[in-house]
């Protein structure tokens, strides 16, 4: 996706205007809504990427058996929720968006982080094991560690 800041701002303003009228962009213009979501994904990737050092440290400690699965789940979840809150504020802040420039290195990082977070529920539901989560964490860690060394 080619990031177009002016278009992103235009879509966000339109979405906010519709929301103030009790309407939503999805119902009014599904294509524009989809385009706005793509811009929001770019922001999500970047926000999570800015916290990559913290995520990598928690992941490395888990992979190196410094912390156990329960400790990993707690530390990762707290970091995830903090980062998600930051994203929720950023995604509607026009001043932040005006300064925003996505990084190609962050591509799909948030997707991996979101998947790890969802895996905790899968373990609770006995859909996967702690070892399977660890394998996925290792895969994500290795994929992105070339961009950041802990």
Language-model segments: residues:
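Acidic, Ser/Pro/Thr-rich low-complexity regulatory regions
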Residues: 1-150
